[in-house]
């Protein structure tokens, strides 16, 4: 392979790499003496040594080489680092490019600024150890491994001029999420999308073990990558001069391949799935660090993973660290004021071409509002509450269809789901855009196209990762999923919620579109698939996060779902969780009433309630609990004709918390107006009942709140038997009310006997007929 770099350029790039490595080591170790003007002393060393060195020199090497590529070819490129524990390297490069000082003026490019840069790293009130939101140029923290490549592809969708360089750590490559992410190339259309350049960094080791991909044969690794649909290019070695030349030549080659692929697709109509290039870079872990510490090998071993030298009570360790840092020859890199020398500064791109300043890595700078149709136009027309049934998600699908239609020109909206768009009854969107598919298409296939905007792959990890990458680079999206299986990405949600929480404290991070989940095919209507498909616990999971990040909505009908979805698609910097059924259910509110109800988040349904002070409050949250509550109200009026009932429906779950805990929370006065201060409250809840207790435990009437919900009982059975198994059925709710109204004490025994007789009749009927009792199946509301 011919040399690409002149000797002069090679020397300068090596010096830039040394500068990044020097700054990285300084962040891990030093709190003073940043330029080593003095002999290194113990009080120059941080008292607690935190950070990860092992991956950092490889990340720094790639950064300087990508900078050369950007500068010479005027590329629009961002950099995603799967091994995000190499945080000091990305901070160092943002500092060398000048972006860090622009974002944080106190960290100026001087001796004092460098000292502050070093001291703040992994320091109280400083910056975290990973490639966190505080790091300019980052859209991927990399603290939890496995999501880098999915984020990279999400960033590349609908960004035709963008190249996303994505470093995949060889440890990260062992995760399930990353393993499936290689298949993202079957969904990237070179005619309209950008390019992803995966760079598999084989440094050989994880924390304390070798990595699988570093220990298989080169032929096996080649076959694996080719099997995934890539053309691997290998860069290997431990001689910096050789690796510099090889890496530079390889990057030129892969850039040429990327441009050729895009040219064929964009200018010659080539619709075949291309074999995209990728790089396998094999360099030592902890390269340029100490060869040995205390007689044990470090460079090129797992011992280089975190802090290679510790315990500075040993004076030999102090000497070893000083020798290591001086090996970078800082006097050749920085002038007497601590500023990077001009001839090295000239290597970095400028302005928005800097990867640390690229607006795609601060997607809110590029965000444009969605062109949303008027959701009122899609409303279910009602003559009164309970007048008809509708499939809520099918109604929503017609709205999303036109959201998609309105965004075809702007290309800033995609719908994501794990092979469930049709199952979840959102398939109206396919009238406007098919499903994206770059693999082979056969005659039996329908709604597949290289130009699709509906993203379906049977991996919740990929759907979540793609969507996050898409949102973080300034676009909009919507993710529908079976309720039970969204748990597959519990931890991915955690990381995104943490990212948003951190961004809220960083002034230069511009708001991005919210991550919107629609969970359907939910617990109460998974009677046909059984116990494995029945789990509403994602609600609890989301509720654990910061109140300035999460929102949870349980619309009781289609019109409320429309109102909620429109609101969520307009929102910024939230995770919005919507739970709604897809089966035909009774509809309760006309569109104007639905908007009012969703705006307040909870309210008395006067049309179902008695005026005045109630004997009992029948509360509900969720579509099936709402039906069961209203059916229980009818039963109670049959059983106790003079009973006074108040029906309260909750659509925004967070209103149950005090306003001091959540911005949507009701103040105590308003909460008491709904739920009273001393009357029994029978609360039928979609999820696990203890969440309601948790949200309301500070309320004055909490002692009287009795919650029914899912209690981990389920099987393949009838729809009504599902609520019976969990004591959420109308008969149980009616009995609960009678048992808790003091003046009805004399009716409790009879009510209990009636309840058990009904349950016996129910169980005998479903066992014989395989369907629910006619009085349940054919029930409808009447005022």
UniProtKB/Swiss-Prot annotation:
Gene Ontology process terms (BP): carbohydrate metabolic process
Gene Ontology molecular functions: aldehyde-lyase activity
Cofactor: thiamine diphosphate
Enzyme class per UniProt: lyase
Keywords: Lyase, Thiamine pyrophosphate
Species of origin: Rhodopseudomonas palustris (strain TIE-1)
Stored Pfam families: XFP, XFP_C, XFP_N
Family: Belongs to the XFP family.
NCBIfam families from the UniProt entry: PRK05261.1-1, PRK05261.1-2, PRK05261.1-4, PRK05261.1-6
Alphabetical list of InterPro entries matching this protein: Phosphoketolase (IPR023962), THDP-binding (IPR029061), Transketo_C/PFOR_II (IPR009014), Xul5P/Fru6P_PKetolase (IPR005593), Xul5P/Fru6P_PKetolase_C (IPR018969), Xul5P/Fru6P_PKetolase_CS (IPR019790), Xul5P/Fru6P_PKetolase_N (IPR018970), Xul5P/Fru6P_PKetolase_ThDP_BS (IPR019789)
Lyase as UniProt keyword: yes
Protein name: Probable phosphoketolase
EC number of the protein: 4.1.2.-
């Amino acid at each position: 392979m011919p040399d690409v770099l002149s000797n002069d350029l090679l020397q300068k790039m090596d010096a830039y790499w040394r500068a990044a490595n020097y700054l990285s080591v300084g962040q891990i170790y030093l709190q003073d003496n940043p330029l080593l003007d003095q002999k290194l002393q113990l009080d120059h060393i941080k008292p607690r040594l935190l950070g990860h060195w092992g991956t950092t020199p490889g990340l720094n090497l790639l950064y300087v080489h990508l900078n050369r590529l950007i500068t010479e070819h005027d590329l629009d490129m961002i950099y995603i680092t799967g091994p995000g524990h190499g945080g000091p390297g990305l901070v160092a490069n943002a500092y060398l490019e000048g972006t860090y000082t622009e974002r944080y003026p106190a960290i100026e490019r001087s001796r004092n600024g460098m000292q502050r840069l070093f001291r703040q790293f992994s320091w109280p009130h400083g910056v975290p150890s990973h490639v966190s939101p505080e790091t300019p140029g980052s859209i991927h923290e990399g603290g939890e491994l496995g999501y880098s490549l999915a984020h990279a592809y999400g960033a590349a969708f609908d960004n035709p001029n963008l190249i996303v360089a994505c470093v995949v750590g060889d440890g990260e490559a062992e995760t399930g999420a990353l393993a499936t992410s290689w298949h993202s190339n079957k969904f990237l259309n070179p005619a309209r999308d950008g390019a992803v350049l995966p760079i598999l960094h084989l440094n050989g080791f994880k924390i304390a073990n070798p990595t699988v991909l570093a220990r298989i044969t080169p032929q096996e690794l080649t076959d694996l990558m080719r099997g995934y649909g890539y053309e691997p290019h290998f860069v290997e070695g431990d001689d910096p001069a050789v690796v510099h030349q090889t890496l530079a030549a390889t990057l030129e080659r892969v850039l040429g391949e990327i441009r050729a692929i895009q040219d064929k697709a964009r200018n010659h109509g080539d619709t075949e799935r291309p074999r995209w290039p990728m790089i396998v870079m094999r360099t030592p872990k902890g390269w340029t660090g100490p060869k040995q510490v205390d007689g044990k090998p470090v460079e090129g071993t797992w011992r280089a993973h975190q802090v290679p030298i510790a315990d500075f009570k040993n004076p030999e360790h102090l000497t070893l660290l000083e020798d290591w840092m001086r090996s970078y020859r800082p006097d050749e890199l920085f002038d007497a004021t601590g500023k990077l020398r001009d001839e090295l500064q000239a290597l970095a791109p400028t302005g928005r071409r800097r990867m640390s300043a690229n607006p795609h890595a601060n997607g809110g700078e590029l965000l444009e509002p969605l062109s949303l149709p008027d959701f009122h136009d899609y409303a279910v027309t009602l003559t009164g509450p309970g007048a008809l049934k509708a499939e809520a998600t099918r109604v929503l699908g017609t709205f999303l269809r036109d959201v998609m239609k309105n965004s075809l020109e702007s290309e800033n909206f995609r719908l994501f789901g794990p092979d469930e768009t049709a199952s979840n009854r959102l398939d109206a969107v396919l009238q406007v855009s098919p499903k994206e598919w770059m693999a082979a298409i056969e005659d039996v296939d329908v709604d597949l196209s290289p130009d699709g905007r509906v993203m379906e792959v049977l991996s919740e990890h990929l759907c979540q990762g793609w969507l996050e990458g898409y949102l973080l680079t300034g676009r909009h999206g919507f993710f529908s999923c079976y309720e039970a299986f969204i748990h597959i990405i519990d931890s991915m949600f955690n990381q995104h919620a943490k990212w948003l929480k951190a961004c809220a404290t960083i002034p230069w991070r511009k708001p991005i579109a919210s991550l919107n989940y629609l969970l359907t095919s939910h617990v109460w209507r998974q009677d046909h698939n059984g116990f494995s498909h029945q789990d509403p616990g994602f609600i609890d999971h989301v509720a654990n996060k910061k109140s300035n990040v999460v929102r949870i909505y349980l619309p009781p009908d289609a019109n409320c779902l429309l109102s909620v979805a429109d609101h969520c698609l307009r929102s910024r910097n939230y995770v919005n969780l919507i739970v709604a059924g897809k089966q035909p259910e009774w509809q309760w509110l006309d569109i104007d009433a639905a908007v009012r109800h969703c705006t307040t988040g909870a309210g008395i349904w006067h049309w179902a309630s008695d005026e005045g002070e109630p004997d009992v409050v029948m509360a509900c949250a969720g579509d099936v609990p709402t039906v069961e509550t209203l059916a229980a109200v009818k039963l109670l009026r049959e059983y106790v004709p003079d009973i006074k009932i108040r029906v309260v429906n909750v659509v925004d779950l967070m209103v149950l918390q005090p306003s001091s805990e959540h911005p949507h929370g009701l103040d105590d006065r308003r909460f008491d107006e709904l739920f009273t201060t001393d009357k029994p409250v029978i609360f039928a809840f979609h999820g696990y009942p203890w969440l309601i207790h948790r949200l309301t435990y500070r309320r004055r009437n909490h002692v009287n709140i009795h919650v029914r919900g899912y209690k981990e009982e389920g099987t393949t059975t009838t729809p009504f038997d599902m609520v019976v198994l969990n004591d959420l059925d109308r008969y149980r709710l009616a009995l609960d009310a009678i048992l808790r109204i003091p003046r009805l004490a004399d009716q409790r025994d009879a009510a209990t006997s009636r309840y058990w007789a009904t349950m016996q009749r129910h169980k005998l009927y479903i066992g014989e007929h395989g369907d629910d009792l006619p009085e349940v199946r054919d029930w409808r509301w009447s005022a």
